[in-house]
């Protein structure tokens, strides 16, 4: 049977469920597919067990169990990630294995916000998940409506505390299990939730609409023509004759792109996703090196000091066998290159164990083009021992 063609007519959005263990994230994911499959026979219902027994994947050497579910509403196509274990969520969010354009925060009305609720909301803020919609689950198990009001207030306060618009974002009250069991009043709440997701999680900006950026992978001298740098265009587009900046390692310089080449053919412009060679005016082979980036003027700047949200690989994942302490000095791998840096541990933390997640302050020995949300790896002698996301730039 031929594979069904991916329908590009509907805009695509990536979402995920977050929240405390046993608050009903996976049950909700299953319930969404069940209710939507009633409206649209093309949508596959995914049972709780099929989502809960998610296969383990390796993302940059880190083992993460993630279930990928897809469904659509009248207006959009969604890819939805759900993780069986708490550690899987942490790894997923920090490594960006599954980028989320928005999250559905699941809180059991029977419990209210719990430690992992807070941890997931904080991480969502740190790694740049931009929008949150709340589903108060298990409302069928709470007889006193005032108790649900209190839980809703607590959730809104928690979101405010971590920089989300807690007073304004939608909170839907429901029962994922009730909906999964086909109870009409709770099925209607799943429809209400998906309407809230449709309305409150905006379409992400497409990579091609963002300012041009290409990490430099290789440099060639072409006699009589000049210097060509190659790499994969990460975002935006670049036209022949455009001025760009070379950012990272040294003083930022301006140059003009005098040629764009792909597969030995000359092009007028290079687009996000293209593996391209760019000919640069007035630049010698020694003026550029791997790890610098070419970018639209003023769109990105070089820095050495930043805060990062980091997951340290466990021994089983091929990470360190021992903890590290203050003054830890590994390599930090950004885009295409390693730069040495020193890590400062949070106040009151003596050491960091393999398998931990931790907020580090890092100072690099040379400046790198960076911005909040950029992912990086931590390496020792070419071996990955950690993964992180920049949560704040200091200097």
Curated annotation (Swiss-Prot):
Function: GTP hydrolase that promotes the GTP-dependent binding of aminoacyl-tRNA to the A-site of ribosomes during protein biosynthesis.
Disulfide bridge partners, by residue number: none
Catalytic activity field: GTP + H2O = GDP + phosphate + H(+)
Organism of origin: Koribacter versatilis (strain Ellin345)
Enzyme class: hydrolase
Lineage of source species: Bacteria, Pseudomonadati, Acidobacteriota, Terriglobia, Terriglobales
Keywords: Cytoplasm, Elongation factor, GTP-binding, Hydrolase, Magnesium, Metal-binding, Nucleotide-binding, Protein biosynthesis
Keyword Protein biosynthesis: yes
Protein name (database record): Elongation factor Tu
Annotated region described as G5, given as residue ranges: 175-177
Any one Gene Ontology molecular-function term assigned to this protein's record: GTPase activity
Residues that, per the record, bind Mg(2+): 26
Record EC number: 3.6.5.3
């Amino acid at each position: 049977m031929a594979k069904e063609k991916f329908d590009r007519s509907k805009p695509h959005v990536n979402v995920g469920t977050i929240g405390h263990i046993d608050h009903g994230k996976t049950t909700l994911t299953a319930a969404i597919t069940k209710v939507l499959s009633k409206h649209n026979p093309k949508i596959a219902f995914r049972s709780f067990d099929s989502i809960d027994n998610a296969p383990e994947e390796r993302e940059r050497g880190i083992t993460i169990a993630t279930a990928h579910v897809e469904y659509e509403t009248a207006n959009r196509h969604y890819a939805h990630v759900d993780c069986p274990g708490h550690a899987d969520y942490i790894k997923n969010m920090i490594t960006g294995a599954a980028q989320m354009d928005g999250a559905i925060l699941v809180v059991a009305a029977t419990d209210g916000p719990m430690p992992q609720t807070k941890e997931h909301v904080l991480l969502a803020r740190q790694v740049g998940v931009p929008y949150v919609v709340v589903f108060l689950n298990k409302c069928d198990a709470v007889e006193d409506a005032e108790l649900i009001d209190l839980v809703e207030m607590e959730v809104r306060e928690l979101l405010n505390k971590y920089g989300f618009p807690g007073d304004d974002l939608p909170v839907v009250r429901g029962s994922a299990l009730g909906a999964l069991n086909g109870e009409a009043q709770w099925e209607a709440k799943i429809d209400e939730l998906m309407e809230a997701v449709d309305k409150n999680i905006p379409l992400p900006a497409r990579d091609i609409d963002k300012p041009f950026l290409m990490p430099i992978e290789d440099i060639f001298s072409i006699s009589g023509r000049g210097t060509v740098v190659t790499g994969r265009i990460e975002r935006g587009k670049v036209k022949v004759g455009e001025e760009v900046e070379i950012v990272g390692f040294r003083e930022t310089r301006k140059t003009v792109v005098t040629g764009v080449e792909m597969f030995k053919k000359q092009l007028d412009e290079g687009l996000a996703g293209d593996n391209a060679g760019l000919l640069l005016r007035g630049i010698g082979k020694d003026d550029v090196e791997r790890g610098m980036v070419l970018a639209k003027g003023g769109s990105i700047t070089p820095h050495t000091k930043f805060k990062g949200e980091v997951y340290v690989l466990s021994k089983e994942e091929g990470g360190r066998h021992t903890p590290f302490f203050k003054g830890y000095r590994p390599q930090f791998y950004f885009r295409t290159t390693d730069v040495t840096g020193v890590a400062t541990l949070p106040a009151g933390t003596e050491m960091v164990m393999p398998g931990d997640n931790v907020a580090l302050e890092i100072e690099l020995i040379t400046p790198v083009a960076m911005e909040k949300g950029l992912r990086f790896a931590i390496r020792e002698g070419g071996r990955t021992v950690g993964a992180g996301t920049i949560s704040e730039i200091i200097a």
